[in-house]
Amino acid sequence: MTEPHYDVTGSGPVLLVVPGGAGHPMGLGPVTERLAERFTVVTYDPLGLAHGGLGSPVADQRPANWSEGAHAVLEEVLAAGESAYVLGTSSGGIAVLDLLARHPGRLRHVVAHEPPCVTLLPDGAGQRARLVAGLRAGQASAEGPMAVFLAHVLEPFTAYAPAFTASPGRLTVAAGADSRGQVLYDTAVSVAERTGGAFAEFPGGHLGALEHPVAFADRVTETLLPVDTPGAPLTT
């Protein structure tokens, strides 16, 4: 495995952020800035696209590629015996679900926002085919990170179905309030039911972290740091 790429900002308990799409953290500056008021925010760039890797050859990705890379990041930034909070959005939400399945001991609480595990839905294969076709049709001339996502991330990640039960209080599966009635809202509900995680609504839609960064960040903070335990220590 190559050295993982990540950026660190803020202070407080560690919050690992895994972006969606191809993992490029573009546009996440405002939400991470807000989160950095309460957390040491570690933003993982699984393909190194924001660290000079854009334009380099990319192999087809699997959730395990990203989750094991995220685990390597945690091994670098956490002291022995510590655990981290985790936030993943969209494809990053799938990666953090897989991270929780593989390495629960390093994780305090995981928030997976609209992970597109659409195969959990009735007619899951059909739902996945329509989702993939719709995204590709709408981004036929995509370049940069979106092109990488469509070519190497979209199909393998949407085939992922979580097959674990989360310990109580360790997983929140979120969907945007503006996504009600849409396939990814229903998917988030199904993921919560499958894993035993809590379900929560967050501000905005699928891109709530970009559309409403302050409100989204505050909802993350409320979820991870309940008001009766602000700045809870990171112990397992």
Regions found by a protein language model. Give the residues of each.
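Active-site loop/oxyanion-hole signature of alpha/beta-hydrolase fold enzymes
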Residues: 46-84, 191
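Conserved hydrolase catalytic core segment
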Residues: 82-121
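C-terminal alpha-helix
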Residues: 73, 219-227
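Conserved HGGG/HGGXW glycine-rich cap/lid loop of the alpha/beta-hydrolase fold
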Residues: 1-53
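Conserved serine/cysteine hydrolase catalytic core
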Residues: 141-211, 217
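Short beta-to-alpha linker loops that shape the active-site pocket of alpha/beta-hydrolase fold enzymes
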Residues: 45-49, 116, 203-205
